[in-house]
Swiss-Prot record:
Source species taxonomy: Eukaryota, Fungi, Dikarya, Ascomycota, Taphrinomycotina
Name under which the protein is recorded: Eukaryotic translation initiation factor 1A
Family: Belongs to the eIF-1A family.
Annotated keywords: Initiation factor, Protein biosynthesis
Coiled-coil residue spans: none
Composition bias, Basic residues: 1-15
Protein origin, superkingdom: Eukaryota
Segments of this protein annotated with the region Disordered: 1-28
GO molecular function, one term: double-stranded RNA binding
Its biological purpose: Seems to be required for maximal rate of protein biosynthesis. Enhances ribosome dissociation into subunits and stabilizes the binding of the initiator Met-tRNA(I) to 40 S ribosomal subunits.
S1-like domain boundaries: 22-96
A GO biological-process term: translational initiation
Originating organism: Schizosaccharomyces pombe (strain 972 / ATCC 24843)
Compositional bias ranges of the Basic and acidic residues kind: 16-27
Amino acid sequence: MPKNKGKGGKNRRRGKNENENEKRELTYAEEGQMYAQVTKMLGNGRIEAACFDGVKRLGHIRGKLRKKVWINQGDIILLSLREFQDEKGDVILKYTADEARTLKNQGELPETAKINETDTFGAEGEDDLDFEFDVDAI
């Protein structure tokens, strides 16, 4: 078999698709859509999101965003509500921190919305536990 003498494979030749510096047009919520903040990552393309109407909903990351747009806890997202299931929705868009601040300044998001903070809704069942070990007792 031939030896690998190159400097990488076909992924290196393709190059990275860097479009971070492009400004995109701000998308506002329409009928049947709601702004939400991610409270928990559930895995398998699902999230728990606290909508700004006070309801916690289960969100499904749609295929267009999956593995392309990384969604983290505390991010502001646009959730499309399902007509037949009120407690579930689909993630349409993830807002950057700058876009979320713009939405907050324009009054689209409530003033209580915390932007770019990971611990958004307090520790649910997570307490700071300190353990002390006695080496002499062992």
